[in-house]
């Protein structure tokens, strides 16, 4: 089942949506509470974090899923056609149909954070295919991807998000299998690791392996992004033996940045492709495939708000925490948990202690949260 565990030596880890503290004059109580409320701000791409962080050091978070229980009760959700996914309680895996004739459909789990090119992150999972056919639509006779990876849900759920155009699917970091459709297609199959930036036009280079998956074999797919060298590395084993050892996708000079917030098993729509004949080849493609996925492990960087505490300083409420570089932090206050007011200027994280102070503290009650946003 999904989890955000800490290492045993860490002393504990609490992760939820908002970093909330309360002020009550004149007794100066300090309270912490959790909330499931979310604020959707697509363009700002912001999130807020809740609870009191008690880690003595920064530890990466991990999402795991082995499908021993119903994943829809463990944080997973479906966008699109629910019929493409079926939890198998006997085999304890997820049966998946990748059908490009349907609308974009995702079986996804929110990460609880926002990843960018300056983050280290990874995903590993098992993949077993029962069957697959590329070019199944005679009007779209070429190949099309079967994909698993990271996406930006707010963008990927828009009608104009089209993986097959080559420029209408921004903010992706994913593994894809392109089967060989035969016919006029001369390029064969491929396995790819790819990142697409926020413009949708700039892709990583490399990350390509000219192999095909086969049915009834168990593949362990690993994608590992390292910020220090701007590489997304793909490794794959087949039945516990090395199959693809080092597929490296590198960010080019034109690659801007990306923002991804969900891990997803993605069945993309074939809509929007160029169906014209180009020298005897129609490059527009389609796919129908069936298989199972299992044993997900997603590794994430430390949360952007750590070691949060709150206290009065000269009769003004002050939040103290460790922030991360490339995040912006703002202190917000509410009296009713419906409307929130910014009560501090935005401060940039730098990997050390940050202090946010309410310069206009209320006369009676006030509840606070720290909002962390990726600019």
Regions found by a protein language model. Name each.
Residues 63, 71-101:
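Extracellular glycan-recognition surfaces and repeat-rich motifs
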Residues 248-288:
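Flexible glycan-contacting loops in extracellular carbohydrate-active proteins
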Residues 67, 287, 294-298:
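Extracellular beta-strand elements of beta-rich domains used
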Residues 67, 125, 212-249:
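Carbohydrate-binding surfaces in secreted/extracellular proteins
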Residues 185-220:
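Short, aromatic/His-centered strand-loop micro-motif at the edge of beta-sheets
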Residues 300-375:
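Short, composition-biased motifs enriched in small/polar/acidic residues
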Residues 56-60:
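Sec/Tat signal peptide C-region and signal peptidase I cleavage site
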Residues 98-194:
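Secretory/extracellular carbohydrate-interaction modules
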